[in-house]
């Protein structure tokens, strides 16, 4: 896998905050023992950019490699990388639970929790403009789905971006 250096200056504050987080993680990583580094690598999320038959997409993976959220298929790599930045920017959104009757509508950006046709719980992350930028797998319980949202919020802001060379 190859690491990308992706910094879009959507807002200077968020870029500065991300840089500070990255520097803190790097300095902690440099002073850690080999076993501590392995644990740190295991706990860090990452965006994995993959080529498909029809374009390019990304998966947000937890430190253990489990896919937390997936994007749509983009026609260009630059659009895919913009989608990653959009997830980072919008993952602070509130949760709108559409499984509850008479639920309260929440302003974008937001996570929408819903049930699919097979009765599984899923979430989708919508950007400020209302576009869906990431979706989840199906979960058997609402608690697991809400946990998935928390993992997106935890992993996305500082996740590194790597290219999946196996599918290239």
Task: Describe these PLM feature segments.
Residues 78:
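Glycine/alanine-rich phosphate-binding loops at beta-alpha junctions
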Residues 16, 20-31, 36:
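Short, positively charged and aromatic/hydrophobic N-terminal segments
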Residues 46-52, 57-74, 83-87, 110-116, ...:
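A structural feature that tracks compact, well-ordered secondary-structure segments
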